[in-house]
Amino acid sequence: MNFHPCYPVDHGVPSWILVLLLSLGLCNLQARADRVLDPDFHENYFEQYMDHFNFESFGNKTFGQRFLVSDKFWKMGEGPIFFYTGNEGDIWSFANNSGFMVELAAQQEALLVFAEHRYYGKSLPFGVQSTQRGYTQLLTVEQALADFAVLLQALRQDLGVHDAPTIAFGGSYGGMLSAYMRMKYPHLVAGALAASAPVVAVAGLGDSYQFFRDVTADFYGQSPKCAQAVRDAFQQIKDLFLQGAYDTISQNFGTCQSLSSPKDLTQLFGFARNAFTVLAMMDYPYPTDFLGPLPANPVKVGCQRLLNEGQRIMGLRALAGLVYNSSGTEPCYDIYRLYQSCADPTGCGTGSDARAWDYQACTEINLTFDSNNVTDMFPEIPFSEELRQQYCLDTWGVWPRQDWLQTSFWGGDLKAASNIIFSNGDLDPWAGGGIQSNLSTSVIAVTIQGGAHHLDLRASNSEDPPSVVEVRKLESTLIREWVAAARLKQPAMPRWPGPKKQHPSR
């Protein structure tokens, strides 16, 4: 297994630098992350096996798995490796929004590695066809974890640090993967920080109404009047639709197409509901650009927009604009282009990455969440296991394995695991689907008061709530202890004592 040939973006890079990087098996694409503490990431490709578990179908065929690496803070031979298990998107997006890892690497003299998940970003086993039906058979959690394990071993060997203690990091689905890495490959990973990892929910456990109930709670907590206004807006849309006033809905909400069928109404409801999901997840106390440009405290801003409009449907339109029209240049909402219904009711996004995630939600990742207009403020949009099965058969020709993650990765019964931190923010609607209490002395749960989706992974900010500052201190301490313990467990090099002394016979 060798690193993929590199193609430098900046052809003016001195040749001696490229030679040095190539000698390490690392080829520089001169890409950088924009952070307060700049890690100076270099983009690389690794020749990764297409199929780790079948010796016949693809043999030794490989694809280019992208990863980012920074040795800016690394004390070679002594510092640990901090390894981000990439999730459902371009790896640069996660690297640019995980500043805590950079800060921690500077403190603990660690090598930083961000590994892209197969089928996402530029890590495409079948090129541009990868996310088309008929080419997705190698997209599984298990294959992705094996990618990470093989890449990590190759890096260690190439850099001559076979025993460097490694800590896995990840957020959301990536947080699930970091925990799974510790569980499946404990000989490679000494511990894991699993931020906002919904390991219980995605295993098909828990309450199907939990997610949208918790999104509602975020807005109700900001303003009970806001939550009621949301209910009123959706009800007005429904009433107008039943009256056949399709043009009125389109004019007030600003859709590009006039609604004409129940399918259009459901699409509009899903489109609007998704805006609330994004605002709740991204409810950070400062402006961000993770899932798109958002202001500080976007839930508060969204409620202000909604309540400032005298007409409720127009208020709903103004709130949705935070997500779908941040530039203010969209003349209307193309609800079928901007939002695509999929096997994840919380939203898949659009484009190739969205198709890959849709497939995963049709196979191993169980996301059967409903809104019911009783425990939440949204229209009734059911998504049962039966509906999931039919959608997945029609779309991908696959039958979901409803309980597979309970079998393969233990569901919520993780007492036998060790050295995992499950962190959640109390503002994050995913928190209710994760581990929320300590399972043992080394599998611990921490809650960030005033924290949204994996806030602790983000770089330190003067607007951070005090709780996340304390949580990061705890995480830093535990990670340092895990690294130290892993070093103590490393076997000493055996020494040959020499020939036994022969005693003369008596």
Curated annotation (Swiss-Prot):
GO terms for biological process: lysosomal protein catabolic process; proteolysis. GO terms for molecular function: aminopeptidase activity; dipeptidyl-peptidase activity; serine-type exopeptidase activity. Disulfide bonds: none annotated. One of its GO terms (cellular component) is cytoplasmic vesicle. Residues 34-36 form a propeptide. Keywords: Aminopeptidase, Cytoplasmic vesicle, Glycoprotein, Hydrolase, Lysosome, Protease, Secreted, Serine protease, Signal, Zymogen. It catalyses: Release of an N-terminal dipeptide, Xaa-Yaa-|-, preferentially when Yaa is Ala or Pro. Substrates are oligopeptides, preferentially tripeptides. Pfam families: Peptidase_S28 (PF05577). It is found in: Lysosome; Cytoplasmic vesicle; Secreted. It comes from the Eukaryota. Glycans are attached at residues 60, 96, 325, 366, 373, 438. Its EC number is 3.4.14.2. Its main location: other. Residues 1-33 form the signal peptide. The active site is at residues 172, 428, 453. PANTHER family: DIPEPTIDYL PEPTIDASE 2 (PTHR11010:SF107), PROTEASE S28 PRO-X CARBOXYPEPTIDASE-RELATED (PTHR11010). Plays an important role in the degradation of some oligopeptides. Belongs to the peptidase S28 family. Homodimer. This is Dipeptidyl peptidase 2. It comes from Mus musculus (Mouse).
